[in-house]
Amino acid sequence: MAKKRIAINGFGRIGRLTFRNLWEMDDVEVVAINDLTDNATLAHLLKFDSAHGKFNHDITSSEDHITISGTKVAASSERDPSKLPWGEMKIDTVIEATGVFRTADQAKLHINAGAKKVVISAPGKGAGITTVVLGVNTDDASSDSTVFSNASCTTNCLAPVVKVLDEAFGIDKGSLTTTHAYTSDQRIQDAPHSDLRRARAAAYNIIPTTTGAAAAVGKVYPPIKDKLFAIAIRVPVITGSMIELNVITNKETSIDEVNAKFKEAAGSHLKGILEYSTDPLVSSDIIGNKHSCIFDSDMTNVLGNLVKVVAWYDNEAGYSARLADLVAQY
């Protein structure tokens, strides 16, 4: 069977880490990269990563290729996706990782260029996009849609947790706080930004801001729609984040009962997606962990039908691993 042919549009943090995952898979091949940055810089950033370490391959670049251990990957710098040679290159799936082309019409520029399918590495904007969180609404990945979204890193952590709790106890309502590593959508030093809190120095401040995870989880797990609100707290770590979810359940429970449900899920239908931990974790402990969420059983608290759970996630490694899985398997 022929390998699935993949192109990546946008070779930033998620694009490069997803490339690393795909490169180790047998049934796919990344044949093209499109990014406005010069190829020498892209090759260097693919090889060396401050958070995730060295990509142990011989990597070189030329005017129109990046070569990894002798295998050439076409590399271009085209601003208009409709002008990319996806038909000529027989591209099966484009990973849209620029963060720019997030509507269905924008993503379909890749379809117009000859690709069969597009997966957006961010929450989609507007209608006509099938959002998938593996382990939660995996069946939707097999739909006839041509434009998909891998949701967000926080939604990929939150949705499996919500699904376990709701199926076991029923969720009436709740609140989410994600304590999140800083990202490129913040300023290193105080500088203008449309969000005045994100305008402040990322490595120096605790920064309250917004997250769309509470709304997004309702798209992939409809029973929870309109039952959660959320806030994000950006903190000065390079990667490694956590969610604290507080919910009112429809029936009373206990710490042991809650933890048992998550342990069961981690060993069965959410294996590889959700990890069950009994260790006293801190954020650096989960850097490089490819699970969507790492359930911290020691942090569970219950007061009647008020339940608090905590789950960790490497907002880069976990998310890019699921993105690679989605692209490779569906």
Predicted regions, residues:
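N-terminal Rossmann-like NAD(P) cofactor-binding subdomain of oxidoreductases
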Residues: 2-199, 323-329
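A generic structural signal for well-ordered coil/turn residues at beta-strand boundaries
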Residues: 62, 128, 202, 239-241, ...
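Short clusters of hydrophobic/aromatic residues that line enzyme substrate/ligand-binding pockets
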Residues: 66, 132-134, 147, 189, ...
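C-terminal active-site/capping subdomain that shapes the small-molecule cofactor and substrate pocket
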Residues: 230, 242, 246-330
